[in-house]
């Protein structure tokens, strides 16, 4: 019963809506807040008096504002949106805290009479609440109960249409932005793009690949294949990288399983050409690995990740605590960490062949643009310290993924055309690299925050890096006459220019303060380090190869052709003199020695060593935060010490009258550690959510007398430790 004296101010800016009573309010007086639009961005629809709310312990706390949809993003604007007060230190200049790019929208649910329903296509009835699940694992709840009916129809229909329905490639905001934005950024930023012949020649020289390898221009104008890059290295298959001992990492696509006579003859001629090449030094020692027979399929990877991400798409704190008691069981059932473990193990096996056996490795996959990219990239990160620098890692992504022809457009399903092609292959690589980063932090110039924002950039359609299936597709869509701009030739931005998204202060979070550059050897030593057949230099653990093995492919050519033209190539073609447990011996031997952070790195893959990438997957869940804890506690202390060292260095330089220059490596001020938590730098200390003494799931188990140990664990009250 409401008191007759109860009054609600017309100037109210926020309301509290509870599940136990309904509060009737008049439309609040709103300040005019307009969205900040990028070049080429157009406002499509908007709705006023929308409440963005957070569900907690059965109650809703919300903020009143405006919900808008543009051809680039969905944005919620409140009075604080136009204010620069309390601006976070780590701020993205393109995507704000309450912004969702259209490509980042995963699923949209409407709430009808407290029941959720997936929204797709045309709507007959419009919901009173809207829940948006994002691919970066954010969850947005909007209440439309106090919004005008016509505005509800426009905003809901607009959001669903522009974020969930199939579209043409040229309709992406990528093209609108590129045609309207000024071309005044430095896209290369020390990153090798591998779009010129010189880039490939320089990479051959850097890795000291065999002198018989050659960068070619055969595919200029895409005369040979639209799938291949304009330039690549031959003679055998596609060259990826050369080890210091001369062994090479190669890749090729698999032959189709079903063939006619003409196709079979063509493939036999191709294999004869391979035989003539690999029967001579330095290719006669070659091991083939068909990744389709040793790693999960793309469908298995997609299924595992779909299950995995559901653990982090939390609607409210009640759901969080109800699943907390069985979280590890749910995690194991997704199989996501097991897939990461298998990929790391496979990369270690390949590294063992290159490093210990001095053997060339040929990776084979249906298209050679998915798991081949994952394994070849991981091997280079593990074996080449240059790939562990920021510019080196970015160059690696350009070489193996962007120029290598990974179908980002299809695998990320940016156009919403086919869910069958969707698979988080690139995200799988970042998860594997993160395992190495958290196991060996001093070995990497970049941080886990760098990997996190790189994963977020998959869904920011102002960069061309992750929005094409091949270099040919990109070149085709940039060469049209209709794409000329007034300021000059049409050019896309690359994600590697981090100044577009972050200012210098924020970019400091991408750089690892613990990293030390590899000391450069003397030129005299560098000249004597190159040998004609470096592959023949053996490590102490490397067994001596008998001369009879050099005729392996000549003796087994017919058998090799049958294998390739058959269903599948088997796993590694193992040498008879190779011990069966050579991988485990190599793995255990390496881990028993001190780590050289500029040398070979092998991931720890046993037991609980493979972990959840907490920063990426838990950063939006306040209940999972550690106040003043997590890796940020260590990083904050290190950065404070570095700041003090830098200030002392400034004083010393001033005494010697030397100019002090600033740059992106400037250390951010983080003195106020009381506001830090494990969510930092993506969020400061958020609301506390105390674990209930009796979790919801326990009530259901009270009548069951079994499993007393588990029940006792559920009754543990940790709330006193969180205060």
What do the predicted segments below correspond to?
Residues 1-3, 12, 719-723:
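A positional/structural detector of protein chain ends, strongest at the extreme C-terminus
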Residues 11-54:
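Disordered, polybasic Ser/Thr-rich segments at the N-terminal boundary of pleckstrin homology
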Residues 27-31, 35, 43, 54, ...:
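Conserved N-terminal structural segment that caps and organizes enzyme catalytic cores in eukaryotes
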Residues 64-66:
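Short, surface-exposed charged micro-motifs
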Residues 78, 105, 109:
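N-terminal cofactor/phosphate-binding cores enriched in small/glycine residues
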Residues 250, 354, 359-381, 433:
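A phosphate-binding catalytic loop at a beta-strand-loop-alpha-helix junction
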């Amino acid at each position: 019963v409401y008191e007759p004296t109860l009054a609600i101010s017309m100037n109210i800016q926020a309301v509290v809506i509870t599940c136990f009573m309904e509060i009737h309010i008049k439309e609040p007086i709103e300040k005019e807040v307009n969205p900040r639009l990028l070049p080429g961005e157009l406002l499509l629809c908007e709705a006023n008096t929308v409440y963005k709310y957070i569900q907690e312990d059965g109650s809703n706390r919300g903020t009143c504002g405006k919900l808008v949809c543009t051809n680039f993003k969905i944005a919620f604007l409140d009075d604080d949106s136009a204010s620069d007060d309390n601006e976070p230190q780590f701020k993205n200049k393109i995507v704000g805290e309450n912004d969702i790019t259209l490509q980042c929208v995963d699923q949209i649910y409407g709430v009808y009479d407290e029941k959720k329903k997936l929204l797709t296509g045309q709507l007959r009835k419009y919901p009173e609440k809207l829940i948006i699940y994002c691919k970066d694992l954010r969850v947005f709840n909007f209440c439309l109960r106090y919004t005008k009916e016509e505005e509800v129809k426009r905003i809901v229909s607009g959001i669903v249409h522009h974020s969930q329905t199939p579209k043409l490639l040229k309709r992406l905001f990528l093209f609108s932005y590129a045609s309207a934005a000024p071309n005044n950024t430095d896209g290369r930023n020390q990153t090798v793009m591998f779009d010129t012949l010189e880039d490939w020649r320089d990479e051959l020289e850097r890795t000291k690949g065999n002198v018989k390898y050659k960068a070619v221009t055969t595919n200029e104008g895409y005369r040979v294949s639209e799938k291949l890059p304009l330039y690549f290295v031959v003679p055998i298959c596609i060259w990826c990288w050369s080890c210091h001992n001369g062994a090479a990492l190669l890749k090729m696509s698999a032959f189709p399983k079903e063939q006619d006579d003409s196709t079979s003859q063509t493939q036999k001629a191709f294999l004869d050409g391979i035989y003539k090449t690999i029967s001579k030094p330095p290719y006669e020692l070659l091991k083939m690995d068909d990744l389709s027979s040793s790693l999960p399929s793309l469908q298995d990877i997609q299924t595992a990740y779909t299950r995995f991400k559901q653990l982090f798409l939390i609607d409210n704190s009640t759901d969080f605590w109800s699943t907390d008691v069985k979280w590890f069981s749910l995690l194991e059932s997704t199989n996501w960490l097991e897939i990461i473990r298998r990929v790391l193990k496979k990369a270690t096996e390949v590294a063992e062949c290159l490093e210990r056996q001095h053997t060339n490795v040929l990776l084979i996959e249906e298209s050679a643009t998915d798991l081949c990219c994952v394994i070849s990239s991981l091997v280079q990160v593990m074996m080449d310290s240059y790939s562990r620098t920021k510019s080196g890692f970015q160059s690696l992504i350009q070489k193996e993924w962007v120029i290598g022809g990974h179908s980002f457009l299809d695998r990320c399903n940016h156009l919403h055309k086919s869910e069958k092609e969707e698979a988080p292959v690139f995200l799988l690589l970042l998860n594997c690299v993160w395992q190495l980063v958290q196991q060996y932090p001093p070995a990497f110039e970049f941080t886990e925050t760098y990997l996190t924002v790189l994963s977020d950039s998959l869904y920011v359609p102002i960069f061309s890096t992750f929005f094409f299936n091949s270099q040919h597709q990109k070149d085709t869509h940039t060469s049209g006459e209709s794409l000329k701009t007034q300021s000059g030739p049409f050019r896309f931005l690359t994600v590697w220019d981090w100044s577009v998204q972050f200012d210098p202060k924020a970019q400091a979070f991408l750089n690892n303060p613990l990293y030390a550059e590899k000391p450069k050897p003397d030129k005299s030593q560098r000249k004597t380090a190159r040998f004609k057949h470096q592959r023949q230099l053996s490590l102490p653990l490397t067994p001596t190869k008998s001369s009879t093995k050099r005729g392996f492919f000549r003796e087994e050519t017919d058998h090799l052709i049958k294998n390739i033209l058959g269903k599948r190539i088997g796993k590694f073609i193992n040498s008879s003199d190779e011990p069966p447990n050579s991988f485990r011996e190599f793995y255990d031997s390496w881990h028993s020695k001190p780590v050289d952070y500029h040398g070979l790195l092998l991931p720890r893959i046993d037991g609980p060593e493979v972990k959840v990438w907490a920063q990426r997957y838990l950063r939006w869940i306040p209940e999972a935060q550690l106040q003043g804890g997590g890796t940020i506690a260590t990083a904050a202390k290190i950065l404070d010490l570095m700041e003090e060292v830098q200030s002392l260095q400034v004083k010393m330089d001033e005494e010697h009258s030397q100019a002090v220059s600033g740059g992106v490596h400037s250390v951010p001020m983080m003195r106020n550690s009381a506001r830090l938590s494990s969510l930092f730098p993506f969020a400061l200390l958020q609301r506390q959510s105390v674990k209930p003494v009796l979790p919801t799931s326990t009530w259901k188990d009270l009548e069951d007398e079994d499993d007393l140990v588990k029940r006792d664990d559920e009754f543990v009250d940790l709330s006193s430790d969180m205060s």
